[in-house]
């Protein structure tokens, strides 16, 4: 099929930077990997949730006030309501919203898992993807080390079930990092660059 522009010439259908097509062979491997990970998390007693890709920006900000929405979220104006919408950049704020609104009276702990696309605004791509597929889990209502141990053990189980053998698990605490920069005036872009450098 030839796609022509309005002058009869060939149209270059290039994707935006930071996104890619997943073609059949890779897509088949991806589907099988996703299935393996989801079955493993379900085996640990976690239940699936599937939040929407688009949410009201203020709802995400309220669900997780410390989340760096200015750097991470793609935003748009809803033509129906005039309110600001955000594309999902991470599942954690959405699961915080779900727990606060749909499970406020539920017995703790809550165990949820999720998977799906996320779209992130990355100030400097440097070969990074803007559209990713994320799978993960949240254990809510367990504040002691046993909760951390459970989620780490489940993650290791997922990696092994996926066929990985040679991997390393790094455990950190984001509050330490936030405390260091609490009194330093940085733009969201500068803070993102520093955070990204530390991760690497």
Feature names for model-found ranges:
Residues 2-200:
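Extended, charged alpha-beta segments that form solvent-exposed binding/catalytic grooves
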